[in-house]
């Protein structure tokens, strides 16, 4: 199996293309400071991860900024703090401040020459526009949680994507799902019968960061530590 075997790359955005962990850590600082305690970045990411996914399951039709507001409330309660309205609103709308990884734009611009590029993201359409402006390419298809009515790892999100691409003439065997999160992406991609590439952004770090702990270790067909590494591997594959 080679990277050149596929026609479409379907991407998770946050954690894969956008550095949501930096964004989340920064956005949680005001609330964290009010505890009077010192948290490591991983501790902040873990409290986010164990509150975000349950909230998405409870309110699958909510816009992502409303998910973030609810996550803020859950974390404040966990820490024994009263919510602050201004903090809550800033956290809820913090996606606009989340940066792209340094290698993302160059890698996407290269890969765009060889594949259809597709987004499958736990976000709403308006929030994704803010991130899309940082990614440097025009995606061929954009599928959000708002479009589907649920959040990954719900299998409906993958069924929706596979069906949408089939209508565009792209068969499931021609799709390479490309993502960081084992929980949100690789387990349901396995279950959907998709080939997948793991962008292991947390290589060298312990734990799962801002993502929920996966129930099992899924199969991944390719593994790269960055999007830049994936683009370079494609160049080498072309050389044979």
UniProtKB/Swiss-Prot annotation:
Enzyme Commission code(s) on record: 3.5.-.-
GO terms assigned for molecular function: hydrolase activity, acting on acid halide bonds, in C-halide compounds
InterPro entries tied to this protein: 2-HAD, HAD-like_sf, HAD-SF_hydro_IA, HAD_sf, S-2-haloacid_dehalogenase
GO cellular component: periplasmic space
Pfam families: Hydrolase
Main location (coarse class): periplasm
Active site per the UniProt annotation: 12
Source taxon at top rank: Bacteria
Keywords: Detoxification, Hydrolase, Periplasm
Catalytic reaction equation(s): (S)-azetidine-2-carboxylate + H2O = 2-hydroxy-4-aminobutanoate
Localization terms from the record: Periplasm
Cited function: Catalyzes the hydrolysis of the toxic natural product azetidine-2-carboxylate (an L-proline analog) by opening the azetidine ring to produce 2-hydroxy-4-aminobutanoate. Is thus involved in the detoxification of this compound but also in the degradation pathway of azetidine-2-carboxylate that allows Pseudomonas sp. A2C to grow on azetidine-2-carboxylate as the sole source of nitrogen. Does not show any detectable 2-haloacid dehalogenase activity with either (R)- or (S)-2-chloropropionate as the substrate, and is not able to hydrolyze L-proline.
Subunit structure: Monomer.
Protein name: L-azetidine-2-carboxylate hydrolase
Natural source organism: Pseudomonas sp. (strain A2C)
